[in-house]
């Protein structure tokens, strides 16, 4: 059994985009994203997940800077460790966008030891050490040294709060990188103003990225066949840090956003939903350095799609 989601998301023009340079507001405008996503539960404790994203322009200009992406992972739930309440699962993941990344995670879920009361209920408390190998970095196919060996830690803390609220913290990565060579590594004190074509000059780095969200969902209307729901996710998406950066660059960056939206759903059958969403996202799209984060602006979006289970 499993599910299939198919949706087309349309992004409009960012507020004030026609009055200033795109590098000040948002480089990605007037484009669409087709997404196919699904899960197949092959056994009671094994799951295959896939997600395919492709992008296209909604006008005559190539007005976005995003790469098509394929993401797949296979998860095996091994059950609880001994007599404990800690669930252990293994996950193998592959991602293809401009490069290729293959990853293994050992996932430990401590949710049963966390909060479970009338005020807060922990749904996930996952801690997952991982190893990831990335090759063809930056889309350079000719270099055998253009790779990244990374060991790190992933964590996710998901909580349900009263009145439709939720609070989620995700350590998206705490990574220790070892690159194929210094040419394909990272900047380390390079003065890019003096030498814009400088080669990257460190073959190792440590970085981290944290996502923190407060969510809110509410049903606005419901009948046997139709429902209208509100949803918003607000927070850091993400707050990141890198040990090695170019000269005078910030080690810390962040994007802070909120994305209120309303969804109309038609429940066609017990296993098929058709839906349409209208919303907007408010974010500092381009200026993300911690010392100079600014230019928060709205970008509208719309979604049409369906969800089906089998």
What is each PLM-predicted segment?
Residues 1-58, 134, 301, 307:
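Short glycine/proline- and aromatic-enriched beta-strand/turn motifs that initiate or cap beta-hairpins
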Residues 2-12, 50-54, 88-94, 127-133, ...:
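Transmembrane beta-barrel strands of outer-membrane/channel proteins
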Residues 2-4, 44-50, 79-88, 114-126, ...:
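Repeated loop/turn-to-beta-strand initiation elements of outer-membrane beta-barrel proteins
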Residues 25-115:
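Outer-membrane beta-barrel channel domains
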Residues 34-36, 72-74, 104-108, 153-155, ...:
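Membrane-embedded beta-strands of outer-membrane beta-barrel proteins
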Residues 71-72, 294-310:
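Outer-membrane beta-barrel "beta-signal"
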Residues 109-248, 308:
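Detector for outer-membrane/organellar transmembrane beta-barrel domains
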């Amino acid at each position: 059994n499993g599910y299939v989601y198919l949706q087309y998301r349309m992004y409009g023009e960012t507020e004030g985009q026609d009055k200033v340079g795109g590098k000040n507001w948002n480089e990605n405008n007037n484009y669409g994203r087709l997404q196919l996503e699904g899960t197949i539960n092959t056994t009671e404790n094994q799951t295959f997940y896939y997600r395919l994203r492709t992008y296209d322009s909604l006008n005559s200009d190539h007005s976005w800077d995003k790469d098509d992406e394929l993401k797949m992972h296979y998860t095996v739930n091994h059950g609880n460790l001994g007599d404990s309440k800690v669930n252990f699962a293994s996950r193998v993941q592959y991602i293809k966008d401009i490069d290729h990344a293959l990853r293994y995670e050992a996932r430990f879920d401590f949710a049963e030891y966390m909060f479970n009361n009338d005020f807060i209920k922990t749904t996930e408390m996952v801690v997952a050490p991982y190893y990831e190998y990335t090759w063809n970095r930056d889309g350079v196919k000719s270099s055998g040294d253009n790779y990244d060996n990374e060991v790190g830690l992933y964590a996710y803390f998901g909580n349900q709060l009263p009145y439709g609220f939720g609070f989620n913290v995700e350590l998206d990565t705490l990574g220790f990188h070892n690159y194929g060579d210094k040419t394909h590594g990272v900047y380390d004190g390079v003065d890019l103003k003096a030498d814009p074509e400088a080669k990257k000059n460190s073959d190792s780095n440590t970085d981290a990225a944290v996502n923190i969200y407060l969510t809110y969902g509410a049903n606005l209307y419901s009948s046997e066949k139709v429902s209208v729901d509100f949803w918003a996710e607000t927070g850091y998406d993400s707050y990141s840090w890198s040990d090695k950066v170019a000269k005078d660059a910030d080690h810390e960056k962040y994007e802070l956003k909120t994305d209120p939206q309303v969804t109309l759903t038609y429940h066609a059958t017990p296993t098929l939903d058709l839906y349409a969403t209208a919303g907007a996202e408010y974010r500092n799209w381009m200026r993300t350095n911690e010392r100079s984060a600014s230019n928060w602006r709205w970008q509208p979006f719309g979604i049409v799609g369906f969800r089906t289970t089998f």
